[in-house]
Amino acid sequence: MKRRLRAYKKTVSIVNEKAIELYKGLGIEKKGFLLEGTDKESGQYTFMGVEPNEIIQSDKDSLVITRKDGSREVREGNPLIRLKEYFDEFEIVKDPGELDFIGGLVGSLGYDYIRYTEVLPDDNPDEIGIETIQLMLADKFIAINHTAETFTAVVLGEDSEEGRIKALKEAEELIKTAREGVDKFKDDKPDMSLDGVILKKSDTLEQYSKKVNKIKNYIKEGHIFQTVLSQRWTIKTGQSGFNLYEKLRELNPSPYMYYFNFGDFEIIGSSPEMIVKQSDNKVYTCPIAGTRKRGATKEQDIALEEELLADEKERAEHVMLVDLARNDMGR
């Protein structure tokens, strides 16, 4: 039986509140998420919420749903199939002029997600013990419109008069809670001191160099087009993931920044790139390839941009990424 829900909203004007302050007001110690956009010109939103009613995680060959009251439901079978079944249980009634996002699942899908659809070797050791699917049900959250300078409390509730009254009351309480915390954290600056100690690197320079040469040979022989070669560093620090996120957004502000607190672990990141987006019946991809340093002046920026566009290698790599993305989308 489908859960028929409607998005109920209350919108207020921003009065000198910053997104990071509003999130702190909701409670950084709670499980929650912050999806932060900073580009006002493109009309980006910031979304945030805490204390999700349900957390959805894979556990080897099953999907586990942990509810706010502590109860757990285990659904055996391919986690991707079970996730699709879970998603299909919801029906959200959309009104005209809705926000692009009015509720649903937010979180992280690891690289091993592909193993749910492809048969591939699986001989990489699991060094961190975090399962592939890590999602939260965002059914009560705040959406900040950076262009209109407003923020909206969104609550998914039953599609009934009783549901409407209850949801709007929760929306008002959400706004009140966020705003009450703002004064406490007003103009609070992140601690930029460094206390990290590197405990482990996944590769030495020699090991990493050998892998690079191996990849080059695979490309020359036509076995692969591209490999994203990464290295994991394990660092000991006394700071929380949110402290590190605050530093990251100061040092590397980007159009797409994210913070997830799952209780046992936190995920942070910052990216200039929107990989894939679905809007109604259209799918968009915007891969980025090639980089240049920033110039000291606007004229230097333009010159570096023209240099990048004229670089045959960079253009070829970008075309390859677009083709790969298009092929994947076509599947």
Locations of the language-model features?
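Extended alpha-helical targeting/anchoring segments
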Residues: M1-R331
